[in-house]
Amino acid sequence: MNLSPREKDKLLISMAAMVARRRLERGVKLNYPEAIALISDFVVEGARDGRAVSELMEAGAHVITRDQVMDGIAEMIHDVQVEATFPDGTKLVTVHEPIR
């Protein structure tokens, strides 16, 4: 299987998000990379489903809460930017203050 660097990145984010979901199910608080991966995966999959950029920007801020991440992680993440493929092309989606 020949994957482009971008496809490899998307696969890595997806896998990290799967790990994060399993940890949340066990009650384990997420670290920085896991939180970023989970939010990023939500945006990428939402774009794939045809959701609007504005909708993903808003909904992306409700994927995880402060109670689900380790102490200090919410303060470290001010914005999450994800390049996602929508039905009409690739767009940059920014989720502001994603952990509330």
From Swiss-Prot:
Highest taxon listed in the record's lineage: Bacteria
Catalytic activity, EC: 3.5.1.5
Localization in the cell: Cytoplasm
Gene Ontology terms: cellular component: cytoplasm
Keyword line: Cytoplasm, Hydrolase
Signal among keywords: no
Main localization, broad class: cytoplasm
Catalytic activity: urea + 2 H2O + H(+) = hydrogencarbonate + 2 NH4(+)
Gene3D superfamilies referenced in this protein's UniProt entry, alphabetically: Urease, gamma-like subunit
Pathway this chain belongs to: Nitrogen metabolism; urea degradation; CO(2) and NH(3) from urea (urease route): step 1/1
Any one GO MF annotation of this record: nickel cation binding
Pfam families reported for this sequence: Urease_gamma
Biological process (GO), any one: urea catabolic process
PANTHER family: UREASE
Similarity remark: Belongs to the urease gamma subunit family.
HAMAP family, per the entry: Urease_gamma (MF_00739)
Record note on quaternary structure: Heterotrimer of UreA (gamma), UreB (beta) and UreC (alpha) subunits. Three heterotrimers associate to form the active enzyme.
This protein's name: Urease subunit gamma
Source species: Allorhizobium ampelinum (strain ATCC BAA-846 / DSM 112012 / S4)
Phylogenetic lineage: Bacteria, Pseudomonadati, Pseudomonadota, Alphaproteobacteria, Hyphomicrobiales
